[in-house]
Amino acid sequence: MMQDIFKHAEQEAPRECCGLVIEDNDNEKYIPLENLSTEKDEFEMDGETFVRYLLKSKIKYVVHSHYDEDCSPSEQDIIQCREVGIPYLIVSYPDKEYTILQP
């Protein structure tokens, strides 16, 4: 799964990638989503898509990447993670490191 996330981060660089990790039949599965943000250092998921996964799946993590930075959460990440109430998995690319931010 992490390999899929890092591949998505590579494909989207220098923009942030975003997606969801869901539990699917007791397995974790990464779902890449389109980043709707026009800013390269921000991410925005489609709200309808997020709600659809929220209603039909167990979302384990909200995922996004930081390009050419470490994986430390920004103030915006901390605020959004608390608002959503789901852990954030933040990856750095090209360093290929990650951190998990709890709400």
Predicted regions: what is each one?
Residues 1-58, 68-103:
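Conserved beta-strand-loop surface patch within small alpha/beta domains used
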Residues 64-66:
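Histidine-centered active-site/metal-ligand motif
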